[in-house]
């Protein structure tokens, strides 16, 4: 668990569910996701994001952001790879929370002997691309014109970070 002067980073817990669902509805829009994302139910959310599958940045009881992680596939030969996604509440952006979450994710990956973190980012989200690059992620692939959003074709960029043992 990491602590700064304003927030703590800890694993997600069942009581965080409503705030995490609300945060997803707030941050995943046409600039950050192929389609806005809204969970149909608490049960659906918990099936996809069980407690402990995210690291949260919290101020008191308020969730400021998260980084979610799960095995990239169910194949045993791919268990050294985590797929991740990160979200920070708009109110809490530009104060180091995303960087702290990413650092905590890298540390957790080392502890769990994960060797690679991967993520996907839309080409229409240059701020996120710059952030991931700053965090050491490399572009491994690009699915050109993968999505058609608001009358424009958008690429899906595949980025990865390799954990040093």
Describe each model-derived feature in a short phrase.
Residues 2-3, 152-165:
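Terminal substrate-recognition subdomain of acyl/acetyltransferases
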Residues 7, 14, 26-91, 102-103, ...:
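Acetyl-CoA-dependent GNAT
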Residues 62-65, 127, 153:
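Glycine-rich acetyl-CoA-binding "A-motif" of GNAT/NAT acetyltransferases
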Residues 109-120:
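Conserved GNAT acetyl-CoA-binding A-motif
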Residues 20, 24:
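Hydrophobic pocket/interface hotspot
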Residues 102, 125-128, 145-150:
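Short glycine/proline-centered loop/turn elements that form peptide/ligand docking sites
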Residues 94-107, 130-134:
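Conserved acetyl-CoA-binding loop-helix of GNAT-fold acetyltransferases
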Residues 71, 118-121, 133, 138-154:
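Conserved catalytic-core motifs of GNAT/GCN5-like acyltransferases
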């Amino acid at each position: 668990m990491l602590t700064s002067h304003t927030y703590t980073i800890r694993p997600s817990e069942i009581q965080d569910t409503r705030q995490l669902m609300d945060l997803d509805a707030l941050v995943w829009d046409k600039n950050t996701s192929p389609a806005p994302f809204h969970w149909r139910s608490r049960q659906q959310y918990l099936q996809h994001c069980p407690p402990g599958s995210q690291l949260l940045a919290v101020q008191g009881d308020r969730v400021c952001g998260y980084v979610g992680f799960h095995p990239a596939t169910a194949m045993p030969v791919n268990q050294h790879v985590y797929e991740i996604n990160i979200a920070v509440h708009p109110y809490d952006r530009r104060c180091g929370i995303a960087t702290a979450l990413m650092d905590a994710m890298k540390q957790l990956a080392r502890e769990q002997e994960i060797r690679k973190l991967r993520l996907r980012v839309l080409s229409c989200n240059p701020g996120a691309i710059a952030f991931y690059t700053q965090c050491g992620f490399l572009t491994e692939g690009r699915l050109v014109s993968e999505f058609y959003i608001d009358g424009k074709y958008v690429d899906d960029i595949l980025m990865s970070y390799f954990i040093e043992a």
